[in-house]
Amino acid sequence: MTEPLIFEKSKSGRKGYTLPKCDVPVQEVSELIPAQFLRKAKADLPEVQENEVVRHFVKLSTLNHHVDKGMYPLGSCTMKYNPKVNEVTSALPGFSALHPLQPQESVQGALKLMYELQEWLKEICGMKAVSLQPVAGAHGELTGILLIRKYHEKQGKPRKKILVPDSAHGTNPASSAIAGYMTVGVKTNARGLTDMDDLRAKLDEDVAALMLTNPNTLGIFESQILEISELLHANGSLLYMDGANMNALLGITRPGDMGFDVVHYNLHKTFSTPHGGGGPGSGPVGVSEKLVEFLPTPAIEKKESGEKTSYCLNYDLPDSIGKMSGFYGNFSIMVRAYTYLLMHGAKGLRAVSENAIINATYLLSRLRGKFDVPYDEQIMHEFCLSGERQKTNGVKTLDMAKRLLDFGFHAPTIYFPLIVKECMMIEPTESETKETLDDFADVMLRIAEEAESNPEMVLNAPHNTPVKRLDDAYASRNINIKYTPKEKETVEA
């Protein structure tokens, strides 16, 4: 049975909460907030008792897929398990009850946590300084590109171009464009690496930076990275690392040692904080020495005075690019990531990446016989398959992704990177056991066999999900995110 919208469960007079008695003088909201910011009519909020609210969202959670329910192999997304201890620590009253405008002396514990998290992230990536302010991966990208722009402006040599590989995440050219740059594509060679001849041909005095993901979205480590770094720096250009695939590098190698000037981290990928519901994310940015002065304001600093240690917010940063979010970043996500780092330590983080690489390598070994491997190189934490072989029977990658849902697995990332035809990008993460990997591989092999022997089974999938095959483009082209009660629709009609 279809679960109604929460609005459709609403009945006048049903309430799931009560407010405490007001203990301050009552004022009309119009006396406190300018009229242009006030609603003209009351919000249409549902009136539902607490147990119905709980049941509603529990039912929805059983209809959706999530990392607590099963493997979630989205490539370049690192959908690892989110440890529940993270939720315990982030809910501690000393963290959850804080207000960002409290006096600094009253939030020393929070500032210490943020400072230590910065220091650990610096060490992990070999950078000179870190800002925790960006609240998402793409937000971290934009911050990094604005830092690069400010650097070149201060040099008196503003530049016009950002180089972006053809395997890059779509946010890379988007971030560059928002920052005012023209993006220029760099080709991938037959081994799945940056084409050095094409890079040299496009590297001129107008290039501000190259944005590179390492390992790249094919799951292959850019083994020419030191040569790339030398080329960029000899040209007066900077090197940016998209940190989406950091889960392959922890404790093994560091972006700073490769010559990167900027890197963004994804706490919601590498450091186990939740992805769900579109956030909240966190995309801290680490920089080399030459970019420290441009980092967002305020900086979180440690002060020593005799035997006393304190932490403060420093707003006196004249060359800063300014604030990148309302306050200091998504603090509760920082607490979760801090907890994850404390639990693992240096050796544990290296084990995370080693196991992520082992899992991906094993899974590829199970699947390579039935699917095409377009770039057959040593992979790291993820890999790309092509569904071109199955397409000869009329079955596309999209169809196989839909069929996977019937077996309790989320589909991998599909049709990205764009340079792989009928692409499936698979990232198992370190969280999954060999048994789960084998279950996933068995299902993938079964689907490959069905594509040959019974293509209709795959073409009409999914068969067992609460909602069958959807129009994948309709919602994007017909956006309607406002609920209007049916009685209002009738009146307005």
UniProtKB/Swiss-Prot annotation:
It catalyses: N(6)-[(R)-lipoyl]-L-lysyl-[glycine-cleavage complex H protein] + glycine + H(+) = N(6)-[(R)-S(8)-aminomethyldihydrolipoyl]-L-lysyl-[glycine-cleavage complex H protein] + CO2. One of its GO terms (biological process) is glycine decarboxylation via glycine cleavage system. GO terms for cellular component: cytosol; glycine cleavage complex. Its EC number is 1.4.4.2. The keyword Oxidoreductase applies. Pfam families: GcvP2_C (PF21478), GDC-P (PF02347). It is an enzyme of class 1 (oxidoreductase). Its cofactor is pyridoxal 5'-phosphate. PANTHER family: GLYCINE DEHYDROGENASE (DECARBOXYLATING), MITOCHONDRIAL, GLYCINE DEHYDROGENASE, DECARBOXYLATING. Belongs to the GcvP family. C-terminal subunit subfamily. This is Probable glycine dehydrogenase (decarboxylating) subunit 2. It comes from Chloroherpeton thalassium (strain ATCC 35110 / GB-78).
